[in-house]
Amino acid sequence: MEPSHKDAETAAAAAAVAAADPRGASSSSGVVVQVREKKGPLRAAIPYMPFPVAVICLFLNTFVPGLGTFVSAFTVLCGARTDLPDRHVCCVFWLNIAAALIQILTAIVMVGWIMSIFWGMDMVILAISQGYKEQGIPQQL
């Protein structure tokens, strides 16, 4: 994966500060460090849904593993966006269906149930963060 233009600017700014410091130690003044979470394709396919829908999916995932994830797959077809903008809607839909099947099939050994609950919590967290972005409020999660 190639670094973005912003990453290159951040690295260049950090290198300039390090070069300007005669002691060789880098100073953090004037340098903006951006931290981004790297997500795999299954996790990046979790849709940004309205908060009530995300809470319903969390409850469904809590009581019937994979059901909330299955429902969330259909929100992608209804226009919910994901962190996979370069993938087609059908591909993201099938990624969510695959995540639901993994959760259902591995629920027997409790792994799927735990994964399903965490998946639902991620849906709620994404819904909350999306709400903050739409309102323009700085967020602290």
Swiss-Prot record:
Main location: membrane
Keyword list, A-Z: Membrane, Phosphoprotein, Transmembrane, Transmembrane helix
InterPro entries, alphabetized: SPEC3/Stum
Pfam families: Spec3
Keyword Transcription: no
Residue ranges the record marks as coiled coil: none
Record-given protein name: Protein stum homolog
Source species of the chain: Homo sapiens (Human)
Encoding gene per record: STUM
